[in-house]
């Protein structure tokens, strides 16, 4: 009898263990792993961490009930009847070869459903090639090289305006200044990091300038992560262009600005691509030295207040507590891409990659964190609704100066010389 009782007790324990394991397995299955691949070390580490924090903020909106936020999926808890988004972080260090190997690891070992990344276009290119070969989804927020969406890829989708779009907008603004303000801008210099992003930005600058009749008098590449830009800035100073287009990320941007101060030179106007210019942390570091530079942006607190009120709610509730600053134009676009992917998964009703890709290719998605309010992808994955404005920074505040529809402040033109600041 004692043996039977003992056997029964052991059987009950085994049954409970099996049931608990089964329950744990079911619980584990209610998770969708999304990889985020950004530069978390190196010269662009601050920007990379901001991008991660924006994706985490979007995940919080999706995973939790947020009736106070009027954004897609915010009112429910999770997607597909309770699935939660789990973010898996990876660091590509700003190195293309590391981006490739980390993308392979995320897909093959971490078993992520999709990757969001990579900030640096030079890292996005090989990482997204890994995704394409594996027939896995790759969502890109802010990498701006136009070539990325000219590869005919099926599984790649990008939110940001390309360098081609921004170059054309920069030239349009110069033409406006020449016509309305008698600016007399006739010559252009281009300074850019010698990477996928920088080289393509420079190519698009040349194309746009040529169409507009602007003469390029200086073409100045530099190695990203440089510790000295004196030679490059002296080259610009010697050519003395009326305008400069800049493509410098993170710490490279602040080094460039400070070097111009050291040599005592400024152009009449400086317009910058999706670079360190957009990062509030970089501008805080520069202080008043950062004033009067301009650049393309898809987000600023002032723009959000007028055109993107729900983005401010998300920012205050989930982003600023992590980053101790507002969204910037780069980071917010990475968060957008998680929202878009989650909407596509919800519409598909399953984790069928091909079905989700078809939805991404054909449908339009409302986006509370996009200036245009919507996202729609063209063949190749470029967002047809991508929108950028030109801002000028003063006292660490971004004021919109162009297009006129969004204009909020009068530009300071020409740039105030260093000696008069």
Short names for language-model regions:
Residues 22-24:
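N-terminal signal peptide c-region/cleavage motif recognized by signal peptidases
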